Amino acid sequence: MIKLFNSLTNKKEPFVPIEEGKVKMYCCGPTVYNYIHIGNARPPIVYDMVRRYLTYRGYDVTFVSNFTDVDDKIIRAANELGEEVAAVAERFIKAYYADTCALNVKEADLHPRVTETMDDIIAFIADLEKKGFAYEAGGDVYFRTRKFNGYGKLSGQALDDLQSGARIEVDERKEDPLDFVLWKAAKPNEISWSSPWGEGRPGWHIECSAMIKKSLGDTIDIHAGGKDLTFPHHENEIAQSEALTGKKLANYWMHNGFVNINNEKMSKSLGNFVLAHDIIQQYSPEVVRFFMLTAHYRTPINFSDELLKGAEAGLERLKNTVANLQHRLAETADMGAEEEWLEKIAGAKQRFIEEMDDDFNSANAISVLFDLAKEANIYMSEAQTSKKVLNAFLELFAEFGEVLGVSFTQQEEELLDAEIEALIEERNVARKERNFARADEIRDLLKEKNIVLEDTPQGVRWKRGS
């Protein structure tokens, strides 16, 4: 049974969906005013992995992730660029798709946008007002925080301990400093929508509540996002939604850890960020994804060239093992199954599932992958091998790769087996003709491609280096 760490209860719990066999999952998406940095890329990667694993375990997952396409930051960016808000948002939505697609993140089943959900947001606020949870003041609408019993249950903060200021917006029009905005009155020359309270636009927190309700209903199974969203964003989502419906917003809350540079959170505000589209030019996107999954999703992960190079080398070892399995399969005679090895492979699959069942522990699951590669290399060192065993290894690597969203097969730019064989044959001919310069040239070329040649009495054998 899958167990996941529920931020709401601060403990691991067995995962029991609302409807058997089905999962409704929402992940807070980006505010589209700039390109995403590597820290922004972690939530899409880790929750894509969670989604893939739930699917692997037989669940029918409906995955929703939003775009905040109107916001103070987008308006500011549009003014600086001399463009319309919609044009800026659209450009960075396309950039987000490009980056996440490169990182092999599957598209959400739904990608709602704030600007396309405006009627639902306004209706949501109006219903809160009718129930006495919201009030209008000077064209703005605020949520009565103290009226909601249970505020602070996600972040573990008591109302009396919260101080106005810092992360609480201070406004003399509020009945209470802890009240937060649901609707903002329009400012001159700023994009706005008509509402019962006049021209304006929604506050950040209400947007997700309305989009969840519209796309997934009153209560969902899993709500996910970065740790930094726990308070006030997710806390306020709970207050708004549960005040309106009287039902739990989400049964399970998941929060991923930060990506740090020099042990400090990467963020645009601190200026210590690396853009995703820059780093995937320097390293392959699957190396970046693999790197992200080498740490448990709840722990912080330090970002550095050294660690990325380590992930790159590790992924290359796994790919070479798979390539050697494929090569060995092509030259292996069909033999009977070897039960001992098939049992070892089945055991690896069981360990992988156990690790992933334990709060989606991709770090430990990847350790199982390296153990599997070690066993595969030991098996391939034997004089005789079985097609059934080799296929079992390959099938399991493919299964694990689908869950992690990382392919362990060779890329197109790598030499194909047939190309290697052709070069070896050309080298053999060159040696027979005593053209040793050409023979050495081919050996060096293969070495550059990480192909190791071994001259034996039976002829030349080759393998991909580890």
Swiss-Prot record:
ATP binds at K268. It is found in: Cytoplasm. Binds 1 zinc ion per subunit. One of its GO terms (biological process) is cysteinyl-tRNA aminoacylation. A motif ('HIGH' region) lies at residues 30-40. The modification Phosphoserine is found at S269. GO terms for cellular component: cytosol. Zn(2+) binds at C28, C208, H233, E237. Its main location: cytoplasm. Its cofactor is Zn(2+). Its EC number is 6.1.1.16. Keywords: Aminoacyl-tRNA synthetase, ATP-binding, Cytoplasm, Ligase, Metal-binding, Nucleotide-binding, Phosphoprotein, Protein biosynthesis, Zinc. A motif ('KMSKS' region) lies at residues 265-269. One of its GO terms (molecular function) is ATP binding. The keyword Acetylation does not apply. Monomer. Belongs to the class-I aminoacyl-tRNA synthetase family. NCBIfam families: cysS. This is Cysteine--tRNA ligase. It comes from Shouchella clausii (strain KSM-K16). The gene is cysS.
